[in-house]
Amino acid sequence: MTKELLLAVCLLPAVFMLHGFEEIVLMQPWLANNSSRIQARFPRLAKHINHAAARSTSAFALAVAEEFILICLVTALSVWYSSYGVWVAVLCAFILHLLLHIGQSLVLKSYIPALATSVLLLPYCVWAVLLLVRWAQFKIWQICLLCILGIVLVAVNLLLALKAADWFDRQLDKYKAGHK
């Protein structure tokens, strides 16, 4: 593995967290100002929007932290064992995540939380994929299969992380109620 590819691999946790910080800091205020507009335009999403808007910033940060820990673990194990398949799957899912944010912004015709880092981090993602194809001897078809795996793994993990966030919010509410 080249130093350049190793750098790209090791940067993923930092890149993810940069994106996560934008989401953590801006999601709740943005939802407070925009949820009614989105619900009016997309009534089928009203239940999901209300649920996301009710989630505390602390609970959302917990979900992002769980994802960050997993990405750090995948990155460390990939480097340790010089086996990058799962890391490629996670990178592909992250790229899709960024593209979805850009798509959401285009559909809403406005800024959404995480748009800035989605645009700013795409060059890193393209660079990492090009390095993988060039130096790690991944074929495009292998990367495509790993992308499917990554999407499934990340989707399942996201559901679990958000369930944990909701549980955390309930515990936080109990704690607050007991300390009044």
Please name every model-derived segment.
Residues 58-77, 120-126:
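Core segments of transmembrane alpha-helices
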Residues 24-53, 167-180:
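Cytosolic, membrane-interface loops and tails of multi-pass inner-membrane proteins
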Residues 19, 45-65, 104-108:
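Membrane interfacial helix-start motif at the N-side
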Residues 2-28:
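N-terminal signal-anchor transmembrane alpha helix
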Residues 12-19, 93-100, 153-154:
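Alpha-helical transmembrane segments of multi-pass membrane proteins
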Residues 92-101, 112-132:
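Hydrophobic alpha-helical membrane segments
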Residues 80-84, 102-112, 135-137:
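Membrane-interface helix caps and helix-loop-helix hairpins in membrane proteins
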Residues 126-180:
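Terminal transmembrane helical module of multi-pass membrane proteins
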